[in-house]
């Protein structure tokens, strides 16, 4: 039996659990007032909220993110006993287009302010690519690109500090922060307690490292563990000749073994938010229940 009061997901008897959530734009396409009870009913206790994707009926420009809007959303989520685990604002922080960057900075500042008004402690972001298309290129893995990213990140982290919000960066194999060592370098160089990590294991994989993925995950836990503020759960299947050769799917429907990651969370991260991605409305409830069962059965 699970007690989901205001997002606290725990087994009766006091065993600490992960707080499993859903990336909201993977859910049914319904008005928010109708959607949230469905999400709660599937066994989720929190959501990953990307305003531009999940709330398309409303503008998400900086000027639209007012205290009134935040209170409306906060009350609606509280009514349905769902936490907003993170607000996603996934823009390219290394674009060479200065006009784009001006707009992007303002969006980050506005999302951080909005998160503080919502009572949401975290804004999540990926780390970009040094081109206007926001796509992988060999220059993603250069010191020059990393320096550009860090320069752009610093004022955004400062804004997060001012509002008491955590900015969580998500390493992705095809982006500038492409692995655990690079991510550790960013954290150390900026040196802020308000800069942490959103750990998405599948996003750290590509065809070059997928064969030794457990080593990749272990390195991430060893180097980034103290700074991991949230986790994304999804899975992958091989797609030879398509895209990058790996396709993201719902957790438990592909090749991933989450045993060691779940053990880490159970031992080190009480009540951490962990949102599922790439689910469908048809399989989301099964995916989260499967993860809960795996988690319960683990001994640490």
Positions of the model-derived regions?
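Short, Lys/Arg-enriched N-terminal segments with co-localized hydrophobic residues
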Residues: 1-16
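Acidic/histidine-rich catalytic cores of soluble enzymes
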Residues: 19-22, 47, 150-251, 255
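Active-site beta-loop-alpha junctions enriched in small/polar residues
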Residues: 23-27, 50-54, 89-92, 128-130, ...
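Short, acidic/polar
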Residues: 29-39, 103-112, 213-220
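Active-site acidic/histidine proton-transfer and metal-coordination neighborhood
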Residues: 33-34, 71, 76-79, 94-197
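Catalytic domains of carbohydrate-active enzymes, especially glycoside hydrolases
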Residues: 35-52, 119
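Conserved, mostly hydrophobic/aromatic
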Residues: 39, 47, 77, 104, ...
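Glycine-rich, proline-tolerant flexible connector loops at the mouths of alpha/beta enzymes
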Residues: 50-72
């Amino acid at each position: 039996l699970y007690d989901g009061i205001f997002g606290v997901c725990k087994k009766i008897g006091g065993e600490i659990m992960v707080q499993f959530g859903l990336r909201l734009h993977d859910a049914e396409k319904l008005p928010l007032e109708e959607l949230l009870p469905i999400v709660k009913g599937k066994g989720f206790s929190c959501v990953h909220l990307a305003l531009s994707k999940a709330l398309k009926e409303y503008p998400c420009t900086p000027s639209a993110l007012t205290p009134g809007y935040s209170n409306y959303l906060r009350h609606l989520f509280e009514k349905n006993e769902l936490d907003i685990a993170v607000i996603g604002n996934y823009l390219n922080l290394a674009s060479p287009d200065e006009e784009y960057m001006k707009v992007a900075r303002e969006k980050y500042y506005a999302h951080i302010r909005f998160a503080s008004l919502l009572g949401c402690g975290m804004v999540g972001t990926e780390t970009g690519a040094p081109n206007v298309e926001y796509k992988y290129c060999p220059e993603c893995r250069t010191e020059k690109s990393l320096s550009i990213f860090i320069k752009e990140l610093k004022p955004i982290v400062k804004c997060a500090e001012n509002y008491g919000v955590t900015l969580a960066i998500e390493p992705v194999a095809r982006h500038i922060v492409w692995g655990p060592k690079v991510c550790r370098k960013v954290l150390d160089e900026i040196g802020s307690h308000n800069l942490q990590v959103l750990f998405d294991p599948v996003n750290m994989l590509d065809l070059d490292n997928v064969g030794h993925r457990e080593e990749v995950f272990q390195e991430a836990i060893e180097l980034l563990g103290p700074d991991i503020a949230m986790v994304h759960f999804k899975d992958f299947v091989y797609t030879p000749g398509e895209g990058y050769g790996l396709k993201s799917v719902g957790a438990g429907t592909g090749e991933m073994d989450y045993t060691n990651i779940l053990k880490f969370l159970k031992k080190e991260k009480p009540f951490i938010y962990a949102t599922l991605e790439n689910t469908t409305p048809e399989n989301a409830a099964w995916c989260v229940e499967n993860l809960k069962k795996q988690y319960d059965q683990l001994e640490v």
